[in-house]
Amino acid sequence: MLDGLRDAVRKFLGSSDYEKAVNEFIKELQIILIKADVNVRLVKDLTDRIKKRITEEKPPSAIEKREWFISIVYDELSRLFGGDKEPEVMPKKLPYIIMLVGVQGSGKTTTSGKLALFYKKKGYKVGLVAADIYRPAAYEQLIQIGQQINIPVYGEPGNKNPIEIATNGLEKFLKEKMNIVIIDTAGRHGYGEEASLLEEMKSMYDKIHPDEVILVIDASIGQKAYDLASRFHQASPIGSLIVSKMDGTAKGGGALSAVIATGAQIKFIGTGEKLDELEVFNPRRFVSRLLGLGDIESIIEKIKSVEDYENLEKRMEDVISGKTKLTLRDIYKQLIALRKMGPLGKIFQMLPGAGILSQVPEEQLKLGEEKIRTFMAIMNSMTYKELDNPSIIDKARMRRIAKGAGVTVEEVKELLKQYQMTNNLLKMVKRRKGLAKLFGGSNQ
């Protein structure tokens, strides 16, 4: 799945015929996702949304069409895998009790160790409870994992009552002031026996009252994950999921998209066999890797910068028409947008009259860049109240602002003077427009 999408993106970005390349890319995307066991309806919905957006939307000025198209694909794939919802993985209270459930073969016991190591690295004291009594090697496996990562494991090999083991282990670790206790429960049920698994989960839950229940799902089951995740999501209001073995299957995309379609939340994905190969599931980061675009965020940032600037242009039209007043906050936002778009020389080339502007000497451009940095530092030292109404700034505040920005009082005065001159100029423009209307003249 990964290589297929990366190759498709590379081929698209290197093509000469944009329209043809778009159609070919969408077809290839459909094939790749269906091969990855993503539900056909989800794939159709995804590609329909992409087609709709490229028909109805227009790329921002100064953005190359291909980059814009890939940013739309990135947005829609991210939405398929959960959008902007990055999970909260840090405990909201201490001690924090986590109960891990999952069918046999899901990688639940190994995931218990991975999760314990993740929290240990974050500075928490963690304990593991081996409450899986049905798989003969489960206790020994967890003991070995605990030794590898230097985390204590509680178990009672002769006891056949998992609830009793969990209760005793929890009591012991809470006495030892553990911050997080992870309980590895029984995994004796196969896929298709979700009802039995959830019934057992409920019995354990009612006795130990964990703060969180996490279901571990093997990525290789693909879109079959939908039924299990759906039932689990309905049965456990405090539940989340870990999708394990993402590295060993082509069906990972199917499993992830199926889980997301249920409304359940994926917290982590297992990316390898090693105990440190567990990562917080960030949909956008995941999609960025799928597309093989390490710099996708820079493309998105570039598009956002141009859109921000276009929004500012609209704001300035409102200022000139008298609908609103220009503030230092407006000027600050303009400078931020300009800085994101690149050096002054590059920006001048994008503006009308670029031929004349391109003749501005390099030294003058450098001075302009320095002045922008100085003015931004000054505005960073101001309060929101001062940015919205600079007239309240007295001499004492000027000194404080200058000190905070690492500039001179004269430079603060210069910024305020420039702001006042700009406002006066805008008043003149408004007056001229008013006179033109009064005498039936042109607004130009």
UniProtKB/Swiss-Prot annotation:
Its EC number is 3.6.5.4. Its main location: cytoplasm. GTP binds at residues 102-109, 184-188, 244-247. Involved in targeting and insertion of nascent membrane proteins into the cytoplasmic membrane. Binds to the hydrophobic signal sequence of the ribosome-nascent chain (RNC) as it emerges from the ribosomes. The SRP-RNC complex is then targeted to the cytoplasmic membrane where it interacts with the SRP receptor FtsY. The keyword Magnesium does not apply. InterPro entries: AAA+_ATPase, P-loop_NTPase, Signal_recog_part_SRP54_M_sf, Signal_recog_particl_SRP54_hlx, Signal_recog_particle_SRP54_M, SRP/SRP_N, SRP54, SRP54_GTPase_dom. Part of the signal recognition particle protein translocation system, which is composed of SRP and FtsY. Archaeal SRP consists of a 7S RNA molecule of 300 nucleotides and two protein subunits: SRP54 and SRP19. GO terms for molecular function: 7S RNA binding; ATP hydrolysis activity; GTP binding; GTPase activity. GO terms for biological process: SRP-dependent cotranslational protein targeting to membrane. The keyword Ligase does not apply. HAMAP family: SRP54. Belongs to the GTP-binding SRP family. SRP54 subfamily. It comes from Sulfolobus acidocaldarius (strain ATCC 33909 / DSM 639 / JCM 8929 / NBRC 15157 / NCIMB 11770). This is Signal recognition particle 54 kDa protein. One of its GO terms (cellular component) is signal recognition particle. Keywords: Cytoplasm, GTP-binding, Hydrolase, Nucleotide-binding, Ribonucleoprotein, RNA-binding, Signal recognition particle. It is found in: Cytoplasm. It is an enzyme of class 3 (hydrolase). The gene is srp54. It catalyses: GTP + H2O = GDP + phosphate + H(+). Composed of three domains: the N-terminal N domain, which is responsible for interactions with the ribosome, the central G domain, which binds GTP, and the C-terminal M domain, which binds the RNA and the signal sequence of the RNC.
